[in-house]
């Protein structure tokens, strides 16, 4: 059983191509079952997010399996296979496994170390399980990938340092207050950046959300998401008295919060400090506001400094994460190689047993009447020869199974001995000799085997 991945992401394709190759969660099961109907696909799972679509397969043969994926993507997107290949990447075996482990660890994301991808990979695996399109190889692969992603985050802390403006705003707020539990936030503006910031503030303990926006309806919509309060824009400064934190992100081309307005607010607060985070460009808050006592004002430059410092921390954590991935990768490869080698060893022993039984029958027929003791001795000799011949190959295969290249040695053994292994097919075939060499009497070279047995039988009879 082999492993391959064909995918597209933000580095390999523009958005208009990624859109055509994306899969919806509600239609995923049908898509998986459709892919399973293609030839050469023994198991499959699809990871599809806003920035990537990756199809993982466990085929009997790489060429046929990958060809089926190209056809499947062409059918789904309406694009020619040649066009799809221009925008996709393809990894097999060792590289495919490493790729998934890096993806789930956040090392292949647009934002290094981001946390969402772990849940997205887990969901992709769950959907494949529900669709019954996985097999033992994909099950083990995704289970170990999820374990790897969790281990990377636990041991390296790669996701602990925020590297986006909304996350950095929350980080600054936590630094200022120690804990955000029970704190209140006033949000000026109801756009995407405002919402992302509030999501993270609430997740970190903020209990009260007030939203003010020039469009009151937009303010209501955002406030309802957090069981908060919407206020009209002309009431902004009245409600600022209730806030510990102010987040401002409007599209205004002038200062929305002026120094004179904030002086009046702070006079009413009576030495109660307030943190103001301006994530708008151009700025919403007059920078002179920071001169007012008990006001802490941060803008995007302050936030970017936090982001840059945290990104450097994540890069250092990523180096440690790569080491963890290699450990998990080698462990999986040992398991996978064992999956390759066990059926091969079984087939090798079966071949030896079949040869032994066939040649024993020939020998018994040619030697005529034999006593049970003589048959037992001949059988014992045959067992000994077969066991000794196969001993080293079996031992070496088991040893190589513990290395990343174990499957290569296994396939080579299958080719050398022309083994028929259930669920596995050598990628290349050994061409058998056109004819066997003949010796005197018309027998094949196996006549030496017969003569050896005859000599042994004669010797045993002479001892009786």
From Swiss-Prot:
**What EC number is given for this enzyme?**
1.2.1.70
Q: What residue ranges carry the coiled-coil annotation? A: none
> What pathway is it annotated to?
Porphyrin-containing compound metabolism; protoporphyrin-IX biosynthesis; 5-aminolevulinate from L-glutamyl-tRNA(Glu): step 1/2
What does this gene product do?
A: Catalyzes the NADPH-dependent reduction of glutamyl-tRNA(Glu) to glutamate 1-semialdehyde (GSA).
Enumerate the UniProt keywords alphabetically: NADP, Oxidoreductase, Porphyrin biosynthesis
The UniProt similarity line reads: Belongs to the glutamyl-tRNA reductase family.
Q: Which PANTHER family match?
A: GLUTAMYL-TRNA REDUCTASE
**Which parts of the sequence bind substrate?**
49-52, 109, 114-116, 120
Does Oxidoreductase appear among the keywords? yes
Q: What is known of its domains?
A: Possesses an unusual extended V-shaped dimeric structure with each monomer consisting of three distinct domains arranged along a curved 'spinal' alpha-helix. The N-terminal catalytic domain specifically recognizes the glutamate moiety of the substrate. The second domain is the NADPH-binding domain, and the third C-terminal domain is responsible for dimerization.
Reactions this protein catalyses: (S)-4-amino-5-oxopentanoate + tRNA(Glu) + NADP(+) = L-glutamyl-tRNA(Glu) + NADPH + H(+)
Q: Where is this site: Important for activity?
A: 99
Extract the CDD domains matched here: NAD_bind_Glutamyl_tRNA_reduct
- What top-level branch of life does the organism fall under? Bacteria
Catalytic residue list: 50
Asked whether the UniProt record includes Signal among its keywords, one would answer no
Q: What's this protein's name? A: Glutamyl-tRNA reductase
Q: What does the record list as GO biological process? A: protoporphyrinogen IX biosynthetic process from glutamate
Enzyme class, broadest EC rank: oxidoreductase
Under the subunit heading, UniProt states: Homodimer.
* GO molecular function list: glutamyl-tRNA reductase activity; NADP binding
């Amino acid at each position: 059983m082999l492993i391959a991945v064909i995918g597209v992401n933000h580095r390999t394709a523009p958005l208009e191509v990624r859109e055509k190759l994306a899969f919806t969660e509600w239609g995923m099961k049908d898509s998986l079952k459709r892919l399973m109907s293609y030839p050469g696909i023994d198991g499959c799972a699809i990871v599809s997010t806003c920035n990537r679509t990756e199809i993982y397969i466990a085929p009997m043969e790489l060429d046929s399996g990958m060809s089926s994926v190209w056809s499947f993507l062409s059918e789904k997107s309406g694009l020619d296979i040649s066009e799809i290949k221009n925008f996709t990447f393809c990894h097999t075996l060792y590289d495919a496994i490493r790729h998934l482990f890096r993806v789930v660890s956040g090392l292949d994301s647009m934002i290094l170390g981001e946390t969402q991808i772990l849940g997205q990979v887990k969901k992709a695996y769950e959907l494949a399980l529900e669709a019954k399109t996985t097999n033992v190889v994909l099950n083990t692969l995704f289970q170990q990938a999820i374990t790897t992603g969790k281990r990377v985050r636990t041991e390296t802390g790669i996701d602990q340092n925020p590297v986006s403006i909304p996350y950095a705003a929350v980080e600054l707020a936590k630094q200022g207050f120690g804990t955000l539990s029970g704190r209140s936030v006033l949000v000026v503006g109801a756009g995407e950046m405002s919402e992302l910031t509030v999501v993270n503030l609430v997740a970190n303990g903020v209990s009260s959300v007030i939203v003010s926006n020039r469009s009151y309806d937009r303010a209501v919509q955002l406030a309802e998401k957090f069981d908060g309060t919407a206020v009209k824009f002309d009431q902004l400064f009245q409600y600022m008295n209730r806030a510990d934190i102010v987040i401002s992100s409007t599209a205004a081309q002038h200062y929305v919060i002026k120094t004179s307005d904030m002086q009046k607010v702070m006079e009413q607060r009576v030495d109660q400090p307030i943190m103001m985070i301006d994530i708008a460009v151009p700025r919403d808050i007059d920078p002179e506001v920071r001169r007012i006592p008990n006001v802490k004002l941060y803008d995007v430059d302050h936030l970017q400094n936090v982001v840059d410092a945290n990104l450097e921390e994540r890069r250092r954590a990523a180096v440690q994460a790569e080491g963890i991935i290699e450990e998990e990768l080698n462990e999986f490869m040992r398991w996978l190689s064992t999956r390759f080698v066990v059926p091969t060893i079984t087939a090798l022993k079966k071949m030896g047993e079949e040869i032994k039984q066939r040649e024993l029958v020939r020998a018994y027929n040619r030697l005529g009447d034999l006593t049970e003791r003589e048959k037992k001795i001949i059988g014992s000799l045959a067992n000994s020869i077969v066991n000794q011949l196969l001993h080293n190959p079996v031992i070496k295969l088991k040893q190589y199974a513990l290395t990343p290249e174990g499957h290569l040695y296994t396939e080579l053994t299958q080719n050398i001995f022309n083994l028929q292994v259930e669920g596995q097919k050598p990628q290349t075939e050994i061409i058998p000799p056109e004819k066997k060499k003949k010796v005197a009497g018309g027998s094949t070279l196996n006549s030496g085997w017969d003569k050896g047995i005859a000599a042994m039988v004669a010797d045993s009879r002479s001892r009786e």
